[in-house]
Amino acid sequence: MMKLYGVRTSPYVRHARVALAESGLSWQFEQVTPDTINLSPTLRVSFLIDGNLTLTDSAVIVRYAREQSGQAFLPSVGDHELFALATSILDTTVNLYLLNIGDSAALAEVATGTSAIGFNPRTYYERQQERIVAGVRGLDQFELDASAPFTDGHIRLACLLDWASYRETIDLLGLNKLNDFLTRMREWPTFAETAPDL
C-alpha cells in the first residue's frame, strides 16, 4: 500500500492528498515524525513511498497518482501555466512565512546592509513580497471555472489560496475572481475534507 508522508497543514501535501483521494488507489496518510522524515532524501514533505519507489515532490506524487489511476495530469498548456504560476507563488509565500513565521514586522526591521557576497535580506524580502502581489494579480486574470471535474491547476491554486487564508499571508481583498473561486472549491467535499485546520 502506498504511504503519503506529510503534515496536514502543508498545501503541497494537501494537493497530493486530494489527488490520491480521487484516484481510488489504496493508500494511507502518515503524519511525518522526526524519525520518518529521514525516509526522504530531501528531508522535507511531501513524500510518497510505494514499494521500492520513493517520490519526493508533490507535483511528481500528483502525476503518479493520476497516471496510476488513468486520470489526466495537466492536460493543457493553460492548466500547466495555472499550476506553475500557483506553485511559484506558493513557493514564495511559504518561504517568506517560514522566514518570519508570520511576523512581517520583524523581517521588515532587518538591517539594510549587504553581506560580503552582496545579499541584502531586506531587499530580498521586499522583492519576494512584490512577486507575491504581482503573481496573485496574474492569477486573478485567469478564467476560473470551479466546477467538477477539477484540474490540477485548479487544485494547486485552491491549495495556495486556502493555505494563504489559513496562515493570513496573502490579502485577497478586491480579488473577486479568486475569492469566488476559493468559496466554490471549499464546497467540493474532496477539497473540504483536506482543509489545513482539520
What does each of the following model-derived ranges do?
Residues 21, 166, 187:
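Short polybasic/polar patches that bind polyanions
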Residues 48, 59, 132-140, 190:
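Aromatic-glycine hotspot motif
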Residues 62, 66, 80-83, 136, ...:
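Non-transmembrane alpha-helical segments in soluble domains
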Residues 176-198:
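Long hydrophobic alpha-helical segments typical of transmembrane helices together
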Residues 73-76, 105-106, 148, 173, ...:
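Short, hydrophobic secondary-structure boundary micro-motifs
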Residues 90-180:
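GST-like fold's C-terminal all-alpha helical module
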Residues 3-4, 169, 193:
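Short, contiguous strand/loop micro-motifs
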Residues 1-123:
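GST-like domain detector, emphasizing the conserved glutathione-binding G-site
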